[in-house]
């Protein structure tokens, strides 16, 4: 049976960073192996940030995280965005923030991030084994026995679980939850986050592919609970876009648990202000002006100088106006309704897209079952956990990768120091 000092299960962001951190401590005084179930390491990492890899965010703080947030405050304090950027700079990767604080590699290529991690790990002796999926893990004397789906058995003194979550199943299948349970850990309710919202509306597919700037307000039982601004993308079944992803964090909680920020609610809707830079009266004045200037123009064309025409036609119909009616026929109350729709179009939310369309997983192994200063398991000595499989998920904008790096570094260092300590006994 092959034996290693440290085996890391999962070759994604947290796992690769853990391997680098571990070998820097060991300095070739121990062996580190990364097992990856996919054919290639870091597949999900390559897809992040539309292939540019949003590494971290200069605005990192506990306020941008959800789940067991109080447990990770010290971790975020120790591993600031500047500290993470410094780690990558030592690997030869230059980073650059954008105007909103999102940090990317200078060359805007996720492949450069993956290469930096792999080269650094290999330089100090990390070995990799791809297409190796661990199906069973057992705690034995002085370590762990790992059994792979192909029958291969391995022994390791320390084990780090960085298997990722259930989101993007093409890149991560979430087997880490099963392995964690085999060693006594629990897993909270899992649900998709940073994903599209589905809505209830007639003739919705006519909007598919349309984009518009908007202010989006999440309404729970009719009361605003969260809002974000940005570009909204209209899909076949609902809405998408970065600002919608922000809403999906809370919508996901609602549909999975019936709560938002742990408070019970019974209904969910989104209200879109499609003209966030204009006041209601300005919108109404514009509509009145258009009806006077172009009395023969079809109602559906009233918005041609103001809004995407497909949205204009949709809202005219929602207001109960025939799209082909001449503008002169539109009554004042109907114009007011149109203006109100433009400034506050309310749509009932029917759900979120599933894990296949989600960027991250909400829920996971509770951090209360770990020592947050080492990421060591309280259930199985010698076991460490990091990354998305834990009950922490962040906002869109580099926050989830930041936690992967920070927890990966902590787990890797801690496992390595434990190895060295055991050698001295």
Task: Show which residues each predicted segment covers.
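Core beta-strand elements of the Rossmann-like FAD/NAD(P) dinucleotide-binding domain
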Residues: 2-4, 148-158, 227-229
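Short hydrophobic core segments
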Residues: 7-9, 35, 134, 153-172, ...
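An anion/pyrophosphate-binding glycine-rich loop and adjacent beta-alpha core
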Residues: 39-41, 55-61, 186-189, 198-329
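Glycine-rich active-site loop/strand segments that organize a redox cofactor
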Residues: 50-100
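A glycine-rich dinucleotide-binding beta-alpha-beta segment and adjacent secondary-structure elements
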Residues: 130, 313-393
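A conserved short coil-to-beta-strand element within the FAD-binding core of flavoproteins
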Residues: 130-143
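Glycine-rich FAD pyrophosphate-binding loop
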Residues: 7, 23-50
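Beta1/beta-strand and adjacent pyrophosphate-binding region of the FAD-binding site
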Residues: 1-14, 33
């Amino acid at each position: 049976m092959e034996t290693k000092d440290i085996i890391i299960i999962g070759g994604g962001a947290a796992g690769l960073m853990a391997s680098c951190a571990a070998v820097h401590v060991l300095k070739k005084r121990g062996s580190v192996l990364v097992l990856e179930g996919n054919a290639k390491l870091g597949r999900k990492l390559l897809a992040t940030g539309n292939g540019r890899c949003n590494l971290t965010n200069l605005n990192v703080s506990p306020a941008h995280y959800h789940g067991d947030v109080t447990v990770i405050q010290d971790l975020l304090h120790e591993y600031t965005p500047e500290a993470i950027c410094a780690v990558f700079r030592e690997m030869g990767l230059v980073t650059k923030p954008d105007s909103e604080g999102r940090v990317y590699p200078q060359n805007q290529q996720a492949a450069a991030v993956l290469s930096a991690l792999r080269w650094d790990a290999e330089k100090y002796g990390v070995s990799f084994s791809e297409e190796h999926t661990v199906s069973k893990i057992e705690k034995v004397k002085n370590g762990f026995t790992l059994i792979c789906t192909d029958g291969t058995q391995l022994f390791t003194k320390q084990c780090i679980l960085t298997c990722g979550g259930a989101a993007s199943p093409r890149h991560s299948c979430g087997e880490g939850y099963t392995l964690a349970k085999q060693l006594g850990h629990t897993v909270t309710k899992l649900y998709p986050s940073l994903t599209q919202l589905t809505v209830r509306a007639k003739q919705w597919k006519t909007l598919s592919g349309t984009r518009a700037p908007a202010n989006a307000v999440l309404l729970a039982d009719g009361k605003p609970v969260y809002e974000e601004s940005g570009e909204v993308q209209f899909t076949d079944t609902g809405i998408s876009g970065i600002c919608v992803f922000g809403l999906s964090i809370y919508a996901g909680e609602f549909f999975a648990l019936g709560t938002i920020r742990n408070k019970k609610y019974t209904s969910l809707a989104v209200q879109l202000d499609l003209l966030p830079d204009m006041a209601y009266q300005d919108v109404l004045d514009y509509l009145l002006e258009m009806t006077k200037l172009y009395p023969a123009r079809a109602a559906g064309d009233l918005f041609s100088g103001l809004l995407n025409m497909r949205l204009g036609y949709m809202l005219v119909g929602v207001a109960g106006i025939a799209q082909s009616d001449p503008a002169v026929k539109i009554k004042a109350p109907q114009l007011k309704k149109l203006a109100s729709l433009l400034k506050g179009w309310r749509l009932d939310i029917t759900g979120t897209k599933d894990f296949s369309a989600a960027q991250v997983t909400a829920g996971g192994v509770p951090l209360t079952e770990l020592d947050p200063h080492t990421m060591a398991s309280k259930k199985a000595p010698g076991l460490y956990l990091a990354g998305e499989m834990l009950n922490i998920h962040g906002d869109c904008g580099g926050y989830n990768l930041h936690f992967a790096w920070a927890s990966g570094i902590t787990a890797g260092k801690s496992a390595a120091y434990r190895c060295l300590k055991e050698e001295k006994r």
